[in-house]
Amino acid sequence: EAGEAFERLIDHPAWIEHMKLFVGGQGTFDHAHGPLFIDENFVNLRGAGKAIGMHSGGYPSILRNQYRFHGGRFMCGQVNALIALTNIGLGDGGTVIVPGSHKSNFEHPDLKKVAMRSEGFGELIEGAIEIQMAAGDVLVFVDGLCHGSAKRSNSGIRRIAVYRYGPSWGNFRHQYRPSKELLKRLTPERRQMVAPYIMWDSEFNQPEKTHA
């Protein structure tokens, strides 16, 4: 809804083929409504003293954001593109990940100390890596990976955008629904990823068919 600059990121060539690969489902029912669905995207601004706690990880297993590799191909429930809109260096509150945690069958022993809504910060968890990014860099990762952020200690604002991709049979996590105005101006490929269940008539005035 924020305009063309953000619409161009829906299927940006730098990562869209990676999303199709990791979400998978080619030649199966998972592609019945198209290759992908974006259930959520947002811009996050973070000032000094702020962070987001660690979350996700392979345990407990969650279908929506699961990592799966089977039969020689990926089938991941949700894959994120995190786009740095500013330089993110030491002290800037960078994204923190625990490598390999998307395959874990056990909860990280320190997770509760640094989880969301706790007083801890991601850089304090054993085995975590804080990722530094230049403006324009994109971090692609399955949402099942344990991730969060470090505490921002520098002045200024960290700015990122996040786009979450999954199979076309998914649904919105929150109550947001795309406006008719947005759907009218999107390309057919982008419209399919934003609203895969709705087939619009040639004028995009009303739904022609809704899939159950």
Question: What name fits each language-model region?
Answer:
Residues E1-A135, G148-I157, P167-R177:
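Non-heme Fe(II) oxygenase catalytic core, chiefly the N-lobe of the double-stranded beta-helix
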